[in-house]
Amino acid sequence: MGKLLRKPLNERIAPGITFVQDINQANSPLSYVGFRLIEMEKGAIYQEELTDLECCIVALTGKITVSEGDNIFAEIGTRANVFEKIPTDSVFISGGRTFQVKADTEKARVALCYSQANRDLPTTLIKASDNSIEQRGKYQNKRLVHNILPDVSEVASSLLVVEVYTDGGNFSSYPPHKHDRDNLPAESLLEESYYHEINPEQGFIFQRVYTDDRTLDETMAVEHQNAVIVPEGYHPVGVPDGYDSYYLNVMAGPKRVWKFHNDPDHEWILERD
């Protein structure tokens, strides 16, 4: 296994709570991005005290109640399966606060997205209806995007969070692009994590992470609930026929701006009629 591919941990940390993924600065090459995926059983309560990190809690599947201080967001979440392809609810929580997540349905799958808290901001419910929806690409390069925390949002100080759906036979994050240089307005420096789900679950997709000089060049067969770390470089995704892909992206860097640079060898595909 390469250093960028993370298989599910499936580590039961408490009754009714299982860590599927746990990516942080201590166990990865990332300096700005953190990610946890937890699976919860009904009635289980997960609590976390944030220090210098802010967090976006995404109700991937099932219903949850999120509490922080006097803020209580009860039974949020819109879908039983991410492949319903409808937006879901999320909650943003700033650094220095303690929050709880309680599972309200028999099963709940929750994503915890982290980055540096650059300033104190109010705890905010990001409703499913607040997500902007985009259809991007053409030919075999089509995908559906749900923007949870885009760079135009003022809810967070550093976090960027987005969901992407790619149907079988298509590529996404394509043509290959990168955002690893602090060179605005042309390109921003953003680390990224990918959390993948696949339908049906026995499938796999391919993801390559590479730099211009190929000092980093990993191509991975990525399975259901795997995560991929992108500290730098281009990072395209290819989805085999017969399977659909979902991934949740978390991005963060020194500036909260998403400006990417396409691989010049492959940018020509954008010029087709």
From Swiss-Prot:
One GO BP: inositol catabolic process
Isomerase keyword on record: yes
Molecular function terms, GO-annotated: 5-deoxy-D-glucuronate isomerase activity; glucuronate isomerase activity
One Pfam family named in its UniProt record: KduI
Catalytic reaction equation(s): 5-deoxy-D-glucuronate = 5-dehydro-2-deoxy-D-gluconate
Pathway: Polyol metabolism; myo-inositol degradation into acetyl-CoA; acetyl-CoA from myo-inositol: step 4/7
InterPro entries on file: Deoxy-glucuronate_isom_IolB, IolB_Bacilli, KduI/IolB_isomerase, RmlC-like_jellyroll, RmlC_Cupin_sf
NCBIfam families in the record: myo_inos_iolB
Entries under HAMAP family matching the protein: IolB
The protein's role, per its UniProt record: Involved in the isomerization of 5-deoxy-glucuronate (5DG) to 5-dehydro-2-deoxy-D-gluconate (DKG or 2-deoxy-5-keto-D-gluconate).
Family, similarity comment: Belongs to the isomerase IolB family.
Name of the protein in its database record: 5-deoxy-glucuronate isomerase
Native source species: Listeria monocytogenes serotype 4b (strain CLIP80459)
